C-alpha cells in the first residue's frame, strides 16, 4: 500500500512537497533534490511524516 509522505526542504525555508511512496519497495527515508521556490534553487528534500 502506498503511504502519503511530506518532503521538507533542507534549506530551512518551511517549504514542502507532498507525495506517496511504497513502503515495501523503499523502506528507507526518501531524499531527493527538488526546486525550492523560496530560495530559487534546487535543494535536498527529506522525508517527514504528515501531521
Curated annotation (Swiss-Prot):
Keywords: Ribonucleoprotein, Ribosomal protein. One of its GO terms (molecular function) is structural constituent of ribosome. GO terms for biological process: translation. GO terms for cellular component: cytosolic large ribosomal subunit. The keyword Ribonucleoprotein applies. Gene3D superfamilies: Ribosomal protein L33 (2.20.28.120). Pfam families: Ribosomal_L33 (PF00471). HAMAP family: Ribosomal_bL33. Belongs to the bacterial ribosomal protein bL33 family. PANTHER family: 54S RIBOSOMAL PROTEIN L39, MITOCHONDRIAL, LARGE RIBOSOMAL SUBUNIT PROTEIN BL33M. This is Large ribosomal subunit protein bL33. It comes from Francisella tularensis subsp. holarctica (strain LVS). The lineage of its organism: Bacteria, Pseudomonadati, Pseudomonadota, Gammaproteobacteria, Thiotrichales. The gene is rpmG.
